[in-house]
């Protein structure tokens, strides 16, 4: 029966208060509400989780063991549910082999296109490569010395899985006796059983020949047989050369012959032109030097000696420590004596020649080393290997993972010198379409690529066009979808690990539209994140198109424009955490405005707003940080000035260069200056001035505050340290002799050892997801019975960890050290979270605000530069209002706050704006305009200014 609604009854997951809701099917539905109100609990943890669980449960038990089965959500019933697909922001692969091209499958079609219509060119001559005839092959073989023993091999299997019983049976029937299987020669009757799940190489020994003048047609006949067996390819293996032969060839050398592709001048040959040779994830295509990563790692002098101001004796050479090793100290003393320098001088005082010898070694020059072991002295004359060669040798020979990780701290990366960062073998890069190889195509932006493909059809001949027609259609469709979701600035070669959550979500959204599915429930988590207002309209049209295909589109969203375009809105609230979890309002945007209890409605109707400041700050006496000549990524020799003591916003369309300018260049360069040992690699620039005016630079990002369940807001902000100190001072604790460690769940003593302070025990299930059960020894309290007997105002330390920030504030009202830490968490809008809530359960926005709270609670020097990249991610407009008060408070304390932001409510409150653009990718990287919000709004060339104008009225 085709139902009209997805009916949810009795939803109680997380903070949901037994809610009932009817979601119209085949509509564009927005779920909104304050951060932490229960939107994701309804959309993802209830509706999507149940849809996914029902699908997985329908599979066989064998299939289920390979899939993650969702726990049944806490809901009485859900009817009218369709197959569910979640497009969230947490599933970006960090694998360096995953790229925009591989995620969207465009690169797979590109590989097919190049394999079918690409033309190979000789790297040596630049001429097209032609096939070899059997006669040409015979002539090449006859150039070998007479008496050379050779094998002619037919490679019938090259890197494929299987047992190949039929192929081997056919070879037996044809009379072949010997094979080379995975490098081992064996009789065809004694062939070992092949593992069908492993890749194999099988070569038939077609003929064994000793070259002489009387061979007649035997060579040509054997070549033809071999070529027929292996689809036009044969190998010649030199088994033995005559003793007195003077030749460039070597024993065991292989020569590849192909009826298809071979350069007559240089001898460069292609065994095949198949899609796999264009794959950097295949051994047939990957560059052998970087193994398809496109990067090489090398020991970096600047990481080995990060601070040139200190001496060798005091530890300038970091991997060699502070020369506590007697052997290292005596080695360095011998070098200093030989080359007449002092290990007590600052490293910067050493000559370039001495530095080169220290890093690279003394070459052939022997040095007198004198080593003492207490009882005797040993004198050795030998060259000095050098710091870098010594580290390379250690890295190559050591097996300890810990030591390898330690050595990795001294490595940097650069483009692979063999493939120039293209990831592929020369064989793949020599195949071109209209003089462009596949690596160059992958480096084009989506917008440039779309234009290139638009003109490509005119440049292909009739045969090529006939072959490529369907491939081009698939590629063009996918490019169009990526353009429609505002990702025209990305390149296909961009690693997926470098994408923001919003970018990766929109890529998967584009892929879903390309799949053309209907009758599906799509659940999306804030797809507008990271998107400039200009591109938002295109995104909304894409979501509508997904709906028009016959799907239900359920979007967790705070964006006003999206709400106005939605068919239906569900507002969860009224507050966050325990104050939320109810359906406050339902209807379209106009209807939501009329609900008094709806905070969303108040902002939509204009009853509540974020006010434009009446005046802007001008900063500290014209002091500024000045970055000159930034050229990282797409930046076009950019110069900027950031006035200190202001709230400055960096704006611009997606991909314009904001993060390249602020994070990759300014932040990393300033951090490197303030902390020379920091392992950061700034983008290229000429000068950075004004750093003498700041003492710290802090990037408050959305990365987790901890990786384990034991990390929580109380431990991160330092509140828990004071809470433990307070418990230690209680009379009962003193009487028992308890120390601070007694109240820690990270060390033995006071914690429950059954669960090691986690409060939960993990039980592995084979056909079901792992189950976490409450520890039955401590009942989930994390501590042992004796520790829990210590109470303050009737509450144990475990009870306090279960309190919300609001409750804990009231509880510790009279204890300033604890209260001050908690009040900052409340100020950033996190009053609803539990102070002991696991860090792994906090959203990116919540983690960022916990970090902000920690900064607020510090004693301010008034000389800190804070950088925040899109701090409004995941925030309701009311939360943004609270966040702005906190950020402006930091500025009022004398600090400088720099935000990269698209949200116009934030931008309009800035003292100073730097607009980067005008477009994304190659068409960006310039400063369009800078100044006050009014200056930006007055600039006709600024996309930001055009939209900002409406917000300043």
Curated annotation (Swiss-Prot):
Zinc finger intervals, C4-type: 752-778
Any one GO CC term of the record: cytoplasm
Pfam families, alphabetized: UvrA_DNA-bind, UvrA_inter
CDD domains, alphabetized: ABC_UvrA_I, ABC_UvrA_II
Disulphide-bonded residues: none
GO biological process: nucleotide-excision repair; SOS response
Keyword DNA damage found: yes
Domain of life of the organism encoding this protein: Bacteria
Its biological purpose: The UvrABC repair system catalyzes the recognition and processing of DNA lesions. UvrA is an ATPase and a DNA-binding protein. A damage recognition complex composed of 2 UvrA and 2 UvrB subunits scans DNA for abnormalities. When the presence of a lesion has been verified by UvrB, the UvrA molecules dissociate.
Subunit description: Forms a heterotetramer with UvrB during the search for lesions.
Similarity-based family: Belongs to the ABC transporter superfamily. UvrA family.
Name the record gives this protein: UvrABC system protein A
Species per Swiss-Prot/TrEMBL record: Rickettsia bellii (strain RML369-C)
Gene name as annotated: uvrA
